Structures are given as C-alpha cells and as structure tokens.
Amino acid sequence: MLAPKKVKFRKMQKGRMNGIAYRGSTVSFGEYGLKVLEPAWITARQIEAARVAIMRHAKKGCKLWIRIFPDKPITRKPAETRMGKGKGNPEFWVAVVKPGRILFELSGVSEEIAKEAFELASHKLPVKTKFVKRQESFV
C-alpha cells in the first residue's frame, strides 16, 4: 500500500477541503482518466483496491498512472479511552482530493475497456467519479 517513507511531522491537523482542484485536473500521461466530482479523503487501501480492479480488467499491455498519493496521517485514540491525554497515534494514510482531480490515468487499451475498468474502480472509491478522455491542446 502507498504511504510516505519519511515525514517531517507524525501528526497533522484535520484541515478543510474547500474549492476545486486546479492542479492535477487534466489527463497528462495516459489517454483516459478517472476524475473526482466531490471532495473526500481517499485512503491508501481504497487506492490499492481501485488499482487492483483496474489492472485485473485491463489485463496486459496497458499502462496505469496513479495521480494521487496518501500523504496525510489520520490518528485514532484506542477504544474505551477517556477524552484528553493528547492526540491519538497515526492509524492510516489518506489523500485529500478536491472536485476535478484526476485519480488514475490509463493507456494502451480501447476506450470501452478503459471505461469498464474505471467503472469497476469507482465502486471501490467513496466518491462520485467521471470518465474523461485526453484533450489535445494546441499551443
């Protein structure tokens, strides 16, 4: 599963997920992408489950890019512990995603297979998603 190798601080504040994603909102590497439509925390386990679902459906000859990384630690206090006595220990890692962010990109497969693979992956994620194609920009 994805997790940072080393962090400057073990614990992090909760934060807010206001606004939309400006960075990472276009398909940059592959031909097809899976775009998020609502803000959420996506855990490392959910990312891995979606990755496995995509790779099982797409088979060999495809390339998958994971465009998000879980870099935020989420802490939990032990069960039946009274309030106070400090913040709990880090339990798992999440990626903070805002609407418009591309989660996965895929190339080397047909559009139908990519659509089906992303549909399977979206069932593993706690957010509404949309299938997008690469837009060729003329600069």
From Swiss-Prot:
UniProt KW Phosphoprotein keyword: no
Any one cellular-component term (Gene Ontology): cytosolic large ribosomal subunit
UniProt keyword annotations, A-Z: Ribonucleoprotein, Ribosomal protein, RNA-binding, rRNA-binding, tRNA-binding
Pfam families: Ribosomal_L16 (PF00252)
SUPFAM superfamilies on file: Ribosomal protein L16p/L10e
Single GO BP term: translation
Keyword Acetylation applies: no
GO MF term set: rRNA binding; structural constituent of ribosome; tRNA binding
Domain of life: Bacteria
Entry function: Binds 23S rRNA and is also seen to make contacts with the A and possibly P site tRNAs.
PANTHER family xref list: 50S/60S RIBOSOMAL PROTEIN L16, LARGE RIBOSOMAL SUBUNIT PROTEIN UL16M
Assembly with partners or alone: Part of the 50S ribosomal subunit.
Family membership noted in the UniProt record: Belongs to the universal ribosomal protein uL16 family.
Record's protein name: Large ribosomal subunit protein uL16
Organism whose genome encodes this protein: Thermodesulfovibrio yellowstonii (strain ATCC 51303 / DSM 11347 / YP87)
Biological classification of the source: Bacteria, Pseudomonadati, Nitrospirota, Thermodesulfovibrionia, Thermodesulfovibrionales
